[in-house]
Amino acid sequence: MIQYVYLKHMRKLWSLGKVRSTVLRFSTTNRNASHLIKNELEQISPGIRQMLNSNSEFLEECSKYYTIAQGKQMRPSLVLLMSKATSLCHGIDRSVVGDKYIDDDDLRSFSTGQILPSQLRLAQITEMIHIASLLHDDVIDHANVRRGSPSSNVAFGNRRSILAGNFILARASTAMARLRNPQVTELLATVIADLVRGEFLQLKNTMDPSSLEIKQSNFDYYIEKSFLKTASLISKSCKASTILGQCSPTVATAAGEYGRCIGTAFQLMDDVLDYTSKDDTLGKAAGADLKLGLATAPVLFAWKKYPELGAMIVNRFNHPSDIQRARSLVECTDAIEQTITWAKEYIKKAKDSLLCLPDSPARKALFALADKVITRKK
């Protein structure tokens, strides 16, 4: 009954036009970063909702659900800022690069001088892939809350959530094809495959599920899984933005490396926040990783000091006392600090990768956003 009332209320707000998108929140010193792409970010959610229109209200309601309580929009922000930062790498006529192929009158008439309509569309596609992954993840993880509201699987059930996620990926694929850039299409298509591969790696949890000893391969396995589930989309969408802007292979590689490092650091800090934040701050359940039986970075670092964690990891913390015991072991070591240090190393690599770009407000914003990954609270 509560879910029905909530959805009815949100539909009323939608019809009255009172649902507003929120954009990535920057600290006071970094507000110029959001100002640089404010106009473009305001078009992300409306553009996505337009692409998700269908003749089925039943389908639209679920597929557009996560565009109502808007998230951080980190991924489209990165794509847009990267597009802006790399637009200074050469002097091509950006008013005629690839935009004639986008079948959207609103986008064709949109011009900033630095961000191409095709790059704006890429930012929307990137967020669509992310939203689809959230719909699927919440079913797999039996989530109850997302962005401070009932998760889609709770509001609509598992079947509708999975089908809505599939629908979003299909519409995103159509938008990719309309970019008429085979290299970009291939990059983003591999992201979708990476998301699935990452979920399968997570099912196994460690490289050798029977081993009770911590090995370097456990950390390597964790990083590979983190790339596939989180960093791949960020890395490849950043790289794709430079391809649409006809940048050099060197610049494209740098953009991809920045995205890879940002994405990996983001996942590391996500694992930290699972221990250090509360549900109402995160907008989702804290402590969920141990309940799902996942061996995240803090657990791996604690395992080095407390070998008994090996058996818990192998058994996916299925004993009634395992979760509380594992949490206590993590908290009485410097595992959290080690994870943060590891994330900071990736942030440094991310910033270093962009030193080949001309100094600009957009590049400074990318640096600021990188720092924000470490200091964020949710």
Swiss-Prot record:
The reaction(s) this protein catalyses: 7 isopentenyl diphosphate + (2E,6E)-farnesyl diphosphate = all-trans-decaprenyl diphosphate + 7 diphosphate
Protein known as: Decaprenyl-diphosphate synthase subunit 1
Keyword Magnesium (UniProt): yes
UniProt cross-references to SUPFAM superfamilies, sorted A to Z: Terpenoid synthases (SSF48576)
Cofactor(s) required, per the database record: Mg(2+)
UniProt: isopentenyl diphosphate binding residues: K72, R75, H130, R147
Gene3D superfamilies: Farnesyl Diphosphate Synthase
Main enzyme class: transferase
Compartments it resides in: Mitochondrion
Note describing how the cofactor binds: Binds 2 Mg(2+) ions per subunit.
Superkingdom assignment: Eukaryota
PROSITE patterns noted in UniProt: POLYPRENYL_SYNTHASE_1, POLYPRENYL_SYNTHASE_2
Family that this chain belongs to: Belongs to the FPP/GGPP synthase family.
GO CC, one annotated term: polyprenyl diphosphate synthase complex
Positions bound to Mg(2+) 1: D137, D141
One GO term of the biological process aspect: ubiquinone biosynthetic process
PANTHER family (UniProt xref): ALL TRANS-POLYPRENYL-DIPHOSPHATE SYNTHASE PDSS1 (PTHR12001:SF69), GERANYLGERANYL PYROPHOSPHATE SYNTHASE (PTHR12001)
Sites where the protein binds Mg(2+) 2: D137, D141
Single GO molecular function: prenyltransferase activity
Keyword Metal-binding in record: yes
Pathway: Cofactor biosynthesis; ubiquinone biosynthesis
EC number(s) stated in the UniProt entry for this protein: 2.5.1.91
InterPro entries: Isoprenoid_synthase_dom_sf (IPR008949), Polyprenyl_synt (IPR000092), Polyprenyl_synt_CS (IPR033749)
Main function: Supplies decaprenyl diphosphate, the precursor for the side chain of the isoprenoid quinones ubiquinone-10.
Assembly notes: Heterotetramer of 2 dps1 and 2 dlp1 subunits.
